[in-house]
Amino acid sequence: MAATNIDVCAVVPAAGYGRRMQTECPKQYLSIGNKTILEHSVHALLAHPRVTRVIIVISPGDSRFAQLPLANHPQITVVDGGEERADSVLAGIKAVGDAEWVLVHDAARPCLHQDDLARLLTLSETSRTGGILAAPVRDTMKRAEPGKNAIAHTVDRSGLWHALTPQFFPRELLHDCLTRALNEGATITDEASALEYCGFHPQLVEGRADNIKVTRPEDLALAEFYLTRTIHQENT
């Protein structure tokens, strides 16, 4: 197993638009306080001493990123993304170099806690396949009838988890699994699903449920509340 003090490179896919936010500005560039959501997300990664480099994957022609202080940060590299998230993550991995382990974190997930990140990073010592931050499902889950807004039945929530990010894997393994899944036309919704497709079983590391992804307009106020609370706790 790898040592606990090895350097880690992070990949942040930030090429999405996020139409559900109902704004002209891509959600990662919306502001919470005096920083964009993307800046909050990246700074949470760089706050851990093992994360020494971040690859940010943006859309070709993105003119907003160059206006951020992140554009001149010595630990940040920017590359162009692809059509789908998996294409963008693969482009980021190719820019990582020879890092043994890679974190992948959503650009629009700004409320990552350092204790969750620290627990996830211990997988480089204990696991050969890596894992993800996740939160157990607490709500009652319903499956709809096909094509209808009608309940088919209640789903047993035991054993169900919400997949969060960061997700943390050996670089070569993630690269190979993403490449195979894309070449074979598999549906890849997150990085762990590429490993699952190839027969691996990444670990679930329980994380805080307030590590939310800003997807809809109401999420912005909630993320601002969580971030303000965290900053207050750190300063007291």
Swiss-Prot record:
One GO biological-process annotation of the entry reads: isopentenyl diphosphate biosynthetic process, methylerythritol 4-phosphate pathway
Q: Which reaction does it catalyse?
A: 2-C-methyl-D-erythritol 4-phosphate + CTP + H(+) = 4-CDP-2-C-methyl-D-erythritol + diphosphate
Q: In which pathway does it act?
A: Isoprenoid biosynthesis; isopentenyl diphosphate biosynthesis via DXP pathway; isopentenyl diphosphate from 1-deoxy-D-xylulose 5-phosphate: step 2/6
Where exactly is the site Transition state stabilizer?
20, 27
User: What are the residue positions of the site described as Positions MEP for the nucleophilic attack?
Assistant: 157, 213
Indicate the enzyme's highest-level EC class. transferase
A Pfam family annotated for this UniProt entry: IspD
Q: Which CDD domains match?
A: CDP-ME_synthetase
Reading the lineage from the top rank, the first entry is Bacteria
Keyword line: Isoprene biosynthesis, Nucleotidyltransferase, Transferase
EC number assigned by the record: 2.7.7.60
| A GO MF term | 2-C-methyl-D-erythritol 4-phosphate cytidylyltransferase activity
Family to which the UniProt record says this protein belongs: Belongs to the IspD/TarI cytidylyltransferase family. IspD subfamily.
The record describes its quaternary structure and partners as: Homodimer.
Q: Which HAMAP family match?
A: IspD
The task this protein performs is described as:
Catalyzes the formation of 4-diphosphocytidyl-2-C-methyl-D-erythritol from CTP and 2-C-methyl-D-erythritol 4-phosphate (MEP).
Instruction: Give the protein name, as stated in the record.
Output: 2-C-methyl-D-erythritol 4-phosphate cytidylyltransferase
Write the lineage as a comma-separated list.
Bacteria, Pseudomonadati, Pseudomonadota, Gammaproteobacteria, Enterobacterales
